[in-house]
Amino acid sequence: MSQQPLCLIVDDSRVIRRMAKDILVSLGLRTAEAEHGLAAVEFCRRTAPEFVLLDWNMPEMDGISCLRALRGMDLNPRPIVVMCTTENGLAKIREALESGADEYIMKPYDREVLLDKLAQVGLVERA
């Protein structure tokens, strides 16, 4: 039996990380956490996750800088990255996608929203 995909949750809010972890674990996925982009980049140098749920606004290194750094790394597998933020302007969404994000979700989100995105990117199947 193969291991379940590893999902890296990157958010400066411990509450958001916990909520996302609870959802991902309930879907049978493995999780790891980072509280800012720099920690996420360091984590990915050691262990390449299959999926990254990445907040935009964080200290140390913001999400878009982290995304660009991740896309500049030779990661195997290349992680699926879903940007997650309160920023909803079309310019922000375009910037995230042009920087290498695979998808984009708005905060606050719930289990159904995250499940839909995970299904869209092929990480889980919708029941």
Give the residues covered by each predicted segment.
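Charged docking surfaces used in two-component/phosphorelay signaling
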Residues: R18-S26
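Receiver (REC) domain active-site loop signature in two-component systems and cognate sites
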Residues: M58
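Helix N-cap/capping motif at the beta->alpha junctions
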Residues: E33-E42, G63-S65
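Alpha4 helix (beta4-alpha4-beta5 surface) of REC/receiver domains from two-component response regulators
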Residues: S65, N88-E103
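Conserved Asp/Asn-Gly motif in the active-site loop of CheY-like receiver
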Residues: A34-L38, I93, R111
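C-terminal output helix
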Residues: A91, Y109-L118
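Active-site beta3 strand of CheY-like receiver
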Residues: T47-L53
